[in-house]
Amino acid sequence: MLETPKVLLKNLQDCKIHFIGIGGIGISGLAKYLKAQGAKISGSDIAISPSVKYLKALGVEINIPHDPKAINHQDVIIHSAIIKEDNTEIQRAKELEIPILSRKDALYSILKDKRVFSVCGAHGKSSITAMLSAICPAFGAIIGAHSKEFDSNVRESADMSLVFEADESDSSFLFSNPFCAIVPNTEPEHLEHYDHDLERFFFAYKYFLDHAQKRVIYKEDPFLKNYSKDAIVLEKKDIYNIQYILKDGEPYTSFELKNLGAFLVWGLGEHNATNASLAILSALDELNLEEIRNNLLNFKGIKKRFDILQKNNLILIDDYAHHPTEIGATLKSARIYANLLNTQEKIIVIWQAHKYSRLMDNLEEFKKCFLEHCDRLIILPVYSASEVKRDIDLKAHFKHYNPTFIDRVRKKGDFLELLVNDNVVETIEKGFVIGFGAGDITYQLRGEM
């Protein structure tokens, strides 16, 4: 199933690497990591993003937008999955016979000599990766989100061990060279990449697990409960005495795990305790138990995952959840947080569906996921993520919520403005608001667009 890429990155010191789509969270992580390894990095993207700004501040030359003139003397080109063959920079690289790698192919070269703790699953992988990197601070880390512990999606380290967030959406997790494969769940997602073939989808997970020396899995998952090879297994009954507290105003979950005693982790919800437990079990051979317990406290959450933007008259939370399962779990956390704050405010959800394909594939579950803990639903237009627009009658499908439909939301000081046709139709000055989506809703809620 896995073919070794024909082009391999060898000596990274002074290797000239150009990234097309450098602003994406996955590509920017590789760019930061390779720069720290001594490579000479350049890149391009269609727009300026926080990742682009960060890399520019490090001295990386970045073209906005893509420009074939940026391709000249590089040793290799690496592009994100979204970049097509007709991209002008790709075409120029072919003319100059510069080797071209997809991010997936580049991973093999970057990780092949590392001791990789590779985390993959439909939900929770960013959190688990960040938690494990907090527990094992000497390890390098490449995460698909910004860890608040070190304010980046990358932590550079000379250590051979690396915590890596792997991606099943394009099967690139198969290239991550897992020493330890950590899988919280295998709920089918991104099936278009697997030709909507569930057998092929689950075979990829089996291949990923089979080729690791060590495996840590959550046995409640329907696929993982039947996995037959040796693995460190977590079951729901292994986590008990779960409690939620505010510590210095921050939300925490305390829990006990197997016979290992009590742990405290930033964030709320049973899923948070599950994620932390998988990270803990993955680290048992690396550190003593007290080090694990203490280091877990360094985890302070990750950007866009139950990201509390403000907590005054208007409590505002930004969350990346874009699948019904994730939204349902995070809404439970929101209710717990509201109860801890002793607020009587109703929970207002602002939702931006991400991709027409995902919305259609999971429509019935989306129609149900707001039933609990959502007191008011506000719906933004679908964020297409470059997909062709499809006609979906959201008003009809979600009429049971009596939702409010808007074009965009705008942060104005400590308030939120709801806009239709560029006209403010409502201002939210107080209450409890949580935004869900993997598109540009995060920038709208932060007043960055």
From Swiss-Prot:
| Reaction equation(s) it catalyzes | UDP-N-acetyl-alpha-D-muramate + L-alanine + ATP = UDP-N-acetyl-alpha-D-muramoyl-L-alanine + ADP + phosphate + H(+)
Question: Care to name a GO molecular-function term for this sequence?
Answer: ATP binding
Q: Where are the transmembrane segments?
A: none
Residues involved in ATP binding: 121-127
NCBIfam families linked: murC (TIGR01082)
Q: Which GO terms describe its biological process?
A: cell division; cell wall organization; peptidoglycan biosynthetic process; regulation of cell shape
Supply the Gene3D superfamilies for this chain.
Mur ligase, C-terminal domain, Mur-like, catalytic domain, NAD(P)-binding Rossmann-like Domain
Q: Which UniProt keywords apply?
A: ATP-binding, Cell cycle, Cell division, Cell shape, Cell wall biogenesis/degradation, Cytoplasm, Ligase, Nucleotide-binding, Peptidoglycan synthesis
The record's section on InterPro entries has: Mur-like_cat_sf, Mur_ligase_C, Mur_ligase_C_dom_sf, Mur_ligase_cen, Mur_ligase_N, MurCDEF_pg_biosynth, UDP-N-AcMur_Ala_ligase_MurC
Q: What is this protein called?
A: UDP-N-acetylmuramate--L-alanine ligase
Question: Would you say which domain of life the source belongs to?
Answer: Bacteria
Q: Does the keyword Ligase apply?
A: yes
Q: What does this gene product do? A: Cell wall formation.
Locations listed in the record:
Cytoplasm
